Amino acid sequence: MILAAGFGTRLFPLTIDRTKPAIPFLGKPLVGYVAEYVAKYGFTEVVVNLHHQPDSVIEALGDGSNFGVRIDYALEEPNILGTAGALDNAKHLLQDEPFLIVNGKIITDINIGALVEAHRLSGALATMVLKPNVKREKFTIVNTKDGCVTGFGPHAKPFTEEEIRDTTGSLESPLMFTGIHILDPRVFEYIPPGIFSDIVTDIYRPALTNGEKIAAHVADGNWFELSTIPRYLDISLAMMNDRDVWLGENCSISPASSVRDSVIWDDVVVADDVNLYRTIIADGVRIEAGEHYENAAIVRADMVRNCTEIPEKALKGYIQGENYIVPLN
């Protein structure tokens, strides 16, 4: 199952007209990479949950055939149900055998080829794929012992100045959850039907208290989570293979302008004497002659004007002419 129902509030305004997994990432919808990833390891029957802007996910994935999978959609109405409630909503599609869950907002090459068999042999309620949080980003710490999850801590804290100066190489990286896990159908015994519930807070924590085994699979490999605009830009630039600009379809960029380290979506027009550096330019935006932007995301202003509510977690922006500008620093 691919989780694709979230609001994407921290990616606003890029998610005004689509859910987070449906945003384009280097020429393909983000959730398309996830579909191809699970197909690579033989998971070809896929359930995708929907809530916010559901049509954007359906448009991105279709029936799944372009990505090597066959998709059943599970719509959550009228309310979003969370990472555990989503499973209950799709129980009729998942309850017959152990199933894989992958967050729809990640890019990864973690090898999960042997994970299903390892899970079967473990007898665990679930097997969580974990990864060292080398940069100590703001993810929940997962505590483990002897290959099992023992509990969940607070968010990891950034390195202190003293730790940064440490040259002994003795600093430990806490483990974090990658959003990839395999669950036994017994998990449905723990999920309250029909209401919002979170898989870690409402299911895994009580299950551990009840003596259930949750296996920990610590993985190598690349893993990127694109839940904020700065992270989306940084990861895009890192994966562009030395390209200076990612250009979408039907774009017109004046040769008299400078565009560097930027991600340009579809139908964008850049007039003369424009300077863009580290920018994300969304669909249909026109950058007028002489404008200069650095470290910014830009969408059409009319999209924001027609938006009933700007999410509290969204970065603050401002309207300039026909565009809505969101500074990223």
Q: Language-model segments: which ranges?
A:
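Generic beta-sheet signal
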Residues: 3, 25, 49, 76, ...
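Glycine-rich "substrate-gating" loop/helix at the edge of Rossmann-like oxidoreductase active sites
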Residues: 20, 76-81, 220-225
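N-terminal glycine-rich phosphate-binding loop and ensuing alpha1 helix
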Residues: 1-58
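Catalytic-core segments of class I nucleotidyltransferases/pyrophosphorylases
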Residues: 98-102, 107, 113-120, 131-136, ...
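Generic preference for hydrophobic
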Residues: 22, 73-74, 152, 216
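Conserved beta-loop-beta/alpha segment of the NTase-like Rossmann-fold superfamily
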Residues: 57-146
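Structural signal for interior beta-strand "rungs" in well-ordered beta-sheet cores
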Residues: 241, 245-329
